[in-house]
């Protein structure tokens, strides 16, 4: 089953005949594989690890699948397809990345849902591309076309990051946020509540949904001997976390994971501001899976602490998995949940 934007690409796939194609920021479908009906080869770069895992089993000698914020090579393509990101500040980065991999006068296709911000494309497209032209309007989605008319600046990741100083009892921490990462340029209220009530941890600790590494850096500033692992599903978040740790001279294992699937073994501590804030059924299911899985991966005497929107129905799930738990702090928006394994 193809998403609506992918269906619009298929409607216009004749423009890709015998092209070497790169698909950036693809969705959780098999559009890159479907394009092999017309394209000579397709490479796909996912910025969402779940999307990568969905496509990766289809890889072959004509379809190569990657996860990350950049490709591991400098290959050039006749066409680059960009899925317009839900986080609009990420769009200029994706256009710059597309330009790095296009042949001169190569074709840029940008697709996205009508309500997803793509209508602002004309203002966002850099001047090394020709003015965007609307090619199709269907399936509640828009498709724009352009071409590479000038040389784009090289991508330096730090140029796409903002920084701010976070004050902690142990001293200031530098937080690095890449474009499109949650709570860019400031500390969100949920994390602020969590940081003001950090537990004392030891041993192997997991930061689930690490984002830009705010929790990780604060933990390591206060408790530098921790063996910390930071996981996220978002490539830009993982890269931000690595930048934050490097900026503060800290070390942690940073890697992608779909839920807890790519972690192994048990942890002495699990701490998180989990990225489950929209209340959608699908998101709630992911949150419930995280709670259940994390309960299984907590060592004896291990500590589990998360912050969550107080209006979301997580209390019952948490109580069902952990039984007796404590609420160390709450405000009108967020609630802190704490549990220590027996």
UniProtKB/Swiss-Prot annotation:
Cellular component, GO, one term: cytoplasm
Top-tier EC class: transferase
Protein location: Cytoplasm
EC number(s) given by UniProt: 2.1.1.172
Entry annotated with the keyword Methyltransferase: yes
Catalytic reaction annotation: guanosine(1207) in 16S rRNA + S-adenosyl-L-methionine = N(2)-methylguanosine(1207) in 16S rRNA + S-adenosyl-L-homocysteine + H(+)
Main location: cytoplasm
Molecular function terms from GO: 16S rRNA (guanine(1207)-N(2))-methyltransferase activity; nucleic acid binding; rRNA (guanine-N2-)-methyltransferase activity
Keywords, ordered alphabetically: Cytoplasm, Methyltransferase, rRNA processing, S-adenosyl-L-methionine, Transferase
GO biological process, one term: rRNA base methylation
Oligomer status and interactors: Monomer.
Task of the protein: Specifically methylates the guanine in position 1207 of 16S rRNA in the 30S particle.
Homology family: Belongs to the methyltransferase superfamily. RsmC family.
Protein name: Ribosomal RNA small subunit methyltransferase C
């Amino acid at each position: 089953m193809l998403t609506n934007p992918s269906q619009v690409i298929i409607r216009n796939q004749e423009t890709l005949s015998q092209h070497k194609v790169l698909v950036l920021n693809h969705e959780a479908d098999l559009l890159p594989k479907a394009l092999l009906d017309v394209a000579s080869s397709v490479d796909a770069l996912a910025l969402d690890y779940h999307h990568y895992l969905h496509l990766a089993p289809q890889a072959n000698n004509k379809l190569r699948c990657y996860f990350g914020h950049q490709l591991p090579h400098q290959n050039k393509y006749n066409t680059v397809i960009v899925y317009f990101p839900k986080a609009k500040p990420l769009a200029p980065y994706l256009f710059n990345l597309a330009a790095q991999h296009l042949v001169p006068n190569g074709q840029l296709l940008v697709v996205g849902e009508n309500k997803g911000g793509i209508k602002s494309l004309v203002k966002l497209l850099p001047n090394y591309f020709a003015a965007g032209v609307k090619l199709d309007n269907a399936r509640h989605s828009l498709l724009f076309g352009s071409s590479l008319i000038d040389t784009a600046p090289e991508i330096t990741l730090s140029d796409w990051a903002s920084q701010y100083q976070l004050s902690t009892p142990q001293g200031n921490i530098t937080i690095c946020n890449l474009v499109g990462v949650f709570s860019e340029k400031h500390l969100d209220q949920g994390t602020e509540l969590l940081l003001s009530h950090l537990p004392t941890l030891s041993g192997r600790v997991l930061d689930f949904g690490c984002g830009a590494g705010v929790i990780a850096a604060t933990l390591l500033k206060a408790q530098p001997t921790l063996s910390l692992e930071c996981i996220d599903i978002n490539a830009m978040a993982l890269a931000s976390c690595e930048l934050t740790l490097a900026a503060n001279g800290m070390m942690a294992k940073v890697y992608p994971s779909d839920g807890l699937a790519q972690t192994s073994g048990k942890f002495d501590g699990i701490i998180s501001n989990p990225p489950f804030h929209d209340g959608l059924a699908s998101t709630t299911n992911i949150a419930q899976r995280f709670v259940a899985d994390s309960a299984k991966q907590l060592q004896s005497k291990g500590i589990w602490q998360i912050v969550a929107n107080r209006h979301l129905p997580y209390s019952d799930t948490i109580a069902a998995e952990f039984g007796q738990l404590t609420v160390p702090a709450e405000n009108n928006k967020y609630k802190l949940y704490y549990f220590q394994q027996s």
